[in-house]
Swiss-Prot record:
Protein name, as recorded: Deaminated glutathione amidase
Residues at the catalytic site: 52 (proton acceptor), 130 (proton donor), 172 (nucleophile)
Reaction equation(s) it catalyzes: N-(4-oxoglutaryl)-L-cysteinylglycine + H2O = L-cysteinylglycine + 2-oxoglutarate
Gene this protein is translated from: nit1-1
CDD domains documented for this protein: nit
Keyword Hydrolase: yes
UniProt-listed Enzyme Commission number(s): 3.5.1.128
GO MF term (any one): deaminated glutathione amidase activity
Length: 291
């Protein structure tokens, strides 16, 4: 099933997203993503977005599994080379959010969690390294995650020009830090990309309101491609990939456990309309806020 929402069809800027259940089987993940990209191409999508961990998600074997399966961005015959070929062959832009990137000569053998934009010529035009890392230890609930043990945080904010507008890049846990998105908006972002793999418990409580808040407060579209379903016996993702407009209206909300695509035709003029109706960025007192 393919879901489509049309907004002011005189403006043909079509963005799509894919919702998948990745595993530690790279070939199977690539096959699923390739099929989704081909569907997107059939439906004339200009930019197609895949979720965090699109290429690989830990099988729960050991805590360094993601690191051991990481690759360099320019690795000969690597997974990113295959996606670059897909983009070029299909004349489509790709947002690949949450790739385990090897760091050359890192003394601690760390990796980056990297969001890539690949253009329709198969060229990487933007790279964002996840800034906010998820470390939590709740003994009473038996929950312990330590992303920073394996992943090195990035420092650079990234806004990327594309045929569909200016893209503000982020990944998953970044969503909880509104200052990041405020900064992206101040860098003229029109569309916020939030590829994610939210856990079910936090997803049910916070996913939708956080996405709507980022859309409303920055008056931007939000495109949030998400992992869904059971990856292995100890890890499940919430799903509910969403596309939200600058007024906060949810245009798409893919059901949990559904591997599918959705797309919309967006009109950048609508962003201007929302910003004119409520010109909050003209009224901000940035010098007065102490953060």
């Amino acid at each position: 099933m393919i879901r489509n929402s049309k907004i002011l069809m005189n403006k043909l800027k079509r963005i799509g997203l894919g919702q998948i259940t990745s595993t530690n089987n790279k070939e199977d993940n690539f096959r699923k993503c390739k099929e989704m990209i081909e569907k997107a191409v059939e439906n004339k999508v200009n930019l197609f977005c895949l979720p965090e961990c699109f290429a690989f998600i830990s099988g729960g074997i050991h805590q360094f599994e993601s690191r051991d399966n990481a690759e360099y961005l320019d690795q000969k015959g690597g997974i990113i080379e295959r996606y670059k070929d897909l983009a070029k062959q299909n004349n489509i832009w790709l947002s690949l959010g949450g790739f385990h990137e090897k760091i050359l000569d890192d003394p601690n053998d760390m990796i980056y969690n990297t969001h890539l934009i690949i253009d329709s010529n198969g060229v990487i035009v933007c790279e964002y390294r996840k800034m906010h890392l998820f470390d939590v230890d709740i003994p009473s609930k038996g929950v312990k995650m330590n992303e920073s043990k394996v992943v090195k945080g990035g420092n650079d904010l990234v806004v990327c020009d594309s045929p569909v507008g200016k893209l503000g890049l982020s990944i998953c846990y970044d969503l909880r830090f509104p200052e990041l998105y405020l900064s992206l908006r101040r860098m003229d972002a029109q569309i916020l990309l939030v590829p994610s793999a939210f856990m079910k418990s936090t997803g049910e409580a916070h996913w939708k309101p956080l996405l709507q808040a980022r859309a409303i407060e920055n008056q931007t579209y939000v495109i949030a491609a998400a992992q869904t379903g059971d990856h292995h016996s100890k890890r499940s993702s919430y799903g509910h990939s969403m596309i939200i407009d600058p007024w906060g209206k949810v245009l798409h909300d893919l059901p949990d456990n559904l591997n599918d695509i959705a797309f919309v035709d967006i009109d950048l003029d609508y962003i201007s309309t929302c910003r004119e109706n409520i010109p909050v960025f003209n009224h901000k007192k940035l010098n007065n806020y102490k953060i």
